[in-house]
């Protein structure tokens, strides 16, 4: 409570208790969730200027990294757009649909929290039916994941969430933590949709235990029986790619990127998350979300709290 007292007169220790009970580790630098979402994140990411980067249709236009999933066509506010974001007619869309290799991925342009709204049409007819009455979406290639990740769960993509921080002291990008997310029983990899998550240490090794949304622990994948004690392949390349992408994001200091390793051993960035960052993957493994940067962030947020700017404007 003492460590976080400057942010609230009454500290809720439920986050601390939960992290301690799950990990067996007690650390005062575990961030209380209500403080993270009301004080820390809004201060570090105190702008709506980059909210357009949460739209998946704009990834390939903004980022120099060309490994994002190929987009076949888009719909933005009811208008159909081609790969280059040029306006096209529905008859053009029908022509594109006839030439696609199925299955494909249909997903909302943004707000896919928990995998909401993501579908995998297996035919022209299924995709056409799914377009009916919908807007603000993108249709992409379906990535074939690397055999290493297929071992854990072959249904959908198993992704690695990489959380990064642009330091307030030197503006350099640092990786905070990484987590492998996997589907279970046919679910997507999102924990809120029934998936599980396994923390990855700084060397790229899984920490041996996966956790579901209820805090239940698994030493082996419930479906495949694969142990969570392996090393992530091409881990250094993952770190390099995540830092490269994050360096192209400005006006925010916290970023979370979701990656999948494809069959060609290439890390494919799937999604960019700038708001509502998930902190419990690391903390449930006994690691404070901000790690060695906790002290500098706390001091920065005390002096530069977003609410102070509102007060000054008034």
Each language-model region and where it sits:
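Conserved N-proximal alpha/beta basic substrate-recognition cap immediately N-terminal to
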Residues: 1-88, 95
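Active-site nucleotide/adenylate-binding loops and adjacent lid/helix of ATP-dependent enzymes
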Residues: 52-160, 165
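Short, solvent-exposed loop/turn segments at secondary-structure junctions
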Residues: 77-78, 110-113, 144-145, 167-169, ...
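Protein kinase-like catalytic core scaffold
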Residues: 104, 174-176, 268-270
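Cytochrome P450 core scaffold surrounding the K-helix E-X-X-R motif
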Residues: 118, 187-189, 279-284
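A long amphipathic alpha-helix within ATP-dependent nucleotide-binding catalytic cores
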Residues: 141-150, 167, 176-262
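Short gly/pro-enriched beta-turn/loop segments at secondary-structure junctions
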Residues: 155-159, 168-174, 193
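C-terminal active-site "lid" helix and adjoining low-complexity regulatory extension at the edge
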Residues: 216-243, 247-252, 261-314
